[in-house]
Structures are given as structure tokens and as C-alpha cells.
Amino acid sequence: MTKDMETIVSLAKHRGFVFPGSDIYGGLSNTWDYGPLGVELKNNVKKAWWQKFITQSPYNVGIDAAILMNPKTWEASGHLGNFNDPMIDNKDSKIRYRADKIIEDYMLNEKGDENFVADGLSFDEMKRIIDEEGIVCPVSGTANWTDIRQFNLMFKTFQGVTEDSTNEIFLRPETAQGIFVNYKNVQRTMRKKLPFGIGQIGKSFRNEITPGNFIFRTREFEQMELEFFCKPGEEIEWQNYWKTFASQWLKDLNLSEEATRLRDHDADELSHYSNATTDIEYRFPFGWGELWGIASRTDFDLKKHSEHSGEDFQYHDQETGEKYIPYCIEPSLGADRVTLAFLCDAYDEEGVEGSKDSRTVLHFHPALAPYKAAVLPLSKKLSGDAIKVFEELSADFAIDFDESQSIGKRYRRQDEIGTPYCITFDFDSLEDEKVTVRDRDTMEQVRMPITELKSFLAEKVKF
């Protein structure tokens, strides 16, 4: 089926996945609050990442670094000088745009070229394309543009009681730098030898010029980042390892392989710190978008922090006697983006066999589903006994309890929020201590002893 972004966003709002931020005050541009189901979904995504990339990895450990860091961090990393977007203003509408994004949108919508990438073009090259193609502002309809200028993406604030330059600090634009400055602390305390990785999940902030597409591009977002340190010369081998590992993680969680692709960055597209980068992209209803950037950052970060701080980041290889600054592979995944990808991928509208009705269903992998099961008493008279099943299961799983409306409507409601299994407690359950378990995807029903429910669900949520 052809999926429509507006329909998916409507479902997300209607069913409590995502709400507009500050809604009662008219909202705040491009801010979103995760509702009861959305926070469960996103937490499950983060849990799945941590499980495979940290807990079950023989190489990696985790940290949780502070959002606010010494401003010298951002001088060393290059963010204060180089973390910019190309900005262009329409003189008639007074609206500011990212020059690369209005070019890419034009190429997609007017030329049908979904593979065009403007990132890496010079300001002059972008302005020439805008002028030659006659790209207009979507609001004013005119091509009356300013020159392209740099726009720093970091949010600035102040620490302490006075607002002057000596108290300037920044909300971090990425979680990576918190890992790099803690490299020696982790390596020493955990007695790690190369290769090894440090991962974390946390909020980052970028003052994007043109955020949009729901939760895909926002100014406040969450990252799941791994910095994997290795011997120089082995970085491409390890980059390939993490490309395969990341792709398999998505596949294991049932993200459509047909809707994902790996795209290598061209030489002129590479970031200043990278000698190789591959993006894992997903085909959203609005087009292809990056989920995961898997970059070889070389020794850029540790070397820069060593130069600015005076700290020696050399690694002493006891096997060879060599000393060197490790190279780093960074698989960086957007938690909000991949959550949106799982939501879009799971969305389906399908006919019901033997009926004129259709149903909306979210085919989440059980490990990601907000609720693993819903306990449904066939009658409110059975609620007192059915709640005991809920209490037993909810000690280990996220379980819904729903006693309102007909059983058919309750099935449809659970399908629409992605609950894999509905457990119906009926009058026979009082006698045989069994329940009817309905599968979300097949709609098949089986009779099962209540005592087997825990082991059944535990097996199903594995991935």
C-alpha cells in the first residue's frame, strides 16, 4: 500500500504516540511530546539498541555524559568554527531556509530525482543552481533571494547570574564529544584494550533552519551513538563490521529491507574529520532520509582534544610496543528518526477476510510494541478475575487492560496501537483456567493455559 505521512501523523496524535509540544498555548514550532504509547515505543527502541550494542557486545561499555560541557570542548571539536548550515532568505516572505534543502526538495518534487544530494556543494554552486533552476520560495512564490550565508547551529546560553561572554556555554549538538573527553577515564577504569567502544544515549540540540517532517528533524532530539576505537589502518575493516551489524539490527526488528539502503558518501560530501562515511537510509513517505551515519572519524577528535587540553591520548600497544592515537568508527543513530521509521514501516491498512470492513494495524516487532499484550475480559462481570492475569503479566511486561466496548472494537483498537497479542478472559476461563490468545497479524486464536502466558510472551519478545 502507498503510505501517507499525514495519515500516520494523525494516527500518532489520535492514539497517544506523539502530541504537539506546548499544545494548549498554540504549540512551539517543531516541538513534539511523546505520549503514553510513544514513550513506550521509543524506550523499547532505545532498550533494543543498548541490549545489542552495549550489554551483549564483548567490545563496548556505556556512559551518560553531561549535556553542558566546558566551552573549550566545542573549540577543540571545531563546532564553534565549522558547525554551520548554508542559510538563504527570501526577501519578500522574510523566511529563512537551508539552501541545500530547498535544492534537494526541488530536485525531488520537480525533477523526480530522489538521489540528488546538495550537501558538499559550495555556496556558489548552490546559489547557481537556485538561480538557474528558478527555485522559488513556497510562501511568496518569488525567487528574490539573498546571498547564502553561514548559520551556526549551536544553542547558546549562559552559566551563572550574569550574561556575558565569560559565562557562555552551549547545549551540546551531539553526544559524541562527551565520549571523547572521557576516553581515558573509561579506558583506564575498565582496563580496556583496543579495539573497544563507548556508547551512550542522550539528548542533543541543533538550531536547525528548516526542521520538519514530524519527528524526523527537530531542534531537540535524542541520539544513540557509539564511538569505537581501533588501531590505525584497521578502521575500514571495522567500519564494514558496524555497517553489517547495524543493518542486521534493523532487519532483526523487522524494518523492511526493501525500504532501506546503504549510501556511501562521495569524497566531496565527507565531513572534515572523516575518511569514509556510509549512511543507512529509510524510504519514508516523504522520501529517503538518513537513519544511521557510520563514519570513520580517523584520529581527528582525540588528536584535537589532546592539542587543546594537553592530555596525552596515545595508546600503548603492549603487544607491538607501538604508541599511537586510536582511530574511531562512529555508528550514530537518531532515536527519534528510527522510531519514526519503525512507526511508518509498521503502518498498514488491510481488508478483513469474509467482511467488507478494513482494519488499521501497526505490525511492530513484539520487542518494540508499546504493549506486549492486552488482557480483555469478555464481560465487565469478569474484570475482577481478569485483572489478576493482568497483575501477573505486568510484573514482567507492559500490558494493557481494556474492558470498554465490544470485544471486536477492542481488538481493532489494539491492532491500531500495535499490540501483538490480545488475551480474552471469558466465562470458561473461570472453570478451565485457560484464555484465548489472538495474534495481531494473523488474527488467529488459540486456547492457552494462563500458566503458560509468561513463557509464551517471553519467547515472542526476543529478537
Swiss-Prot record:
Q: Major location, coarse class?
A: cytoplasm
Reaction(s) catalysed by this chain's protein: tRNA(Gly) + glycine + ATP = glycyl-tRNA(Gly) + AMP + diphosphate
PROSITE patterns given in the database record: AA_TRNA_LIGASE_II
| Pfam family for this entry, one | HGTP_anticodon
Top EC class, one word: ligase
Keyword terms: Aminoacyl-tRNA synthetase, ATP-binding, Cytoplasm, Ligase, Nucleotide-binding, Protein biosynthesis
Q: Name one GO biological process term.
A: glycyl-tRNA aminoacylation
Q: Report the EC number(s), separated by commas if there are several.
A: 6.1.1.14
One GO cellular-component annotation of the UniProt record comes to: cytoplasm
GO MF, one annotated term:
glycine-tRNA ligase activity
Residues binding ATP: 206-208, 216-221, 290-291, 334-337
Q: Binding positions for substrate?
A: R98, E174, F221, E222, Q223, M224, E225, E330, P331, S332, L333, G334
Disulfide-bonded cysteines = none
What the entry lists under InterPro entries is as follows: aa-tRNA-synt_IIb (IPR002314), aa-tRNA-synth_II (IPR006195), aa-tRNA-synth_II/BPL/LPL (IPR045864), Anticodon-bd (IPR004154), Anticodon-bd_dom_sf (IPR036621), Gly-tRNA_synthase/POLG2 (IPR027031), Gly_tRNA_ligase_bac (IPR022961), GlyRS-like_core (IPR033731)
Q: Where in the cell is it found?
A: Cytoplasm
Biological function: Catalyzes the attachment of glycine to tRNA(Gly).
Subunit and interaction comment = Homodimer.
Q: Which family does it belong to?
A: Belongs to the class-II aminoacyl-tRNA synthetase family.
Q: What is this protein called?
A: Glycine--tRNA ligase
Q: Which organism is it from?
A: Staphylococcus saprophyticus subsp. saprophyticus (strain ATCC 15305 / DSM 20229 / NCIMB 8711 / NCTC 7292 / S-41)
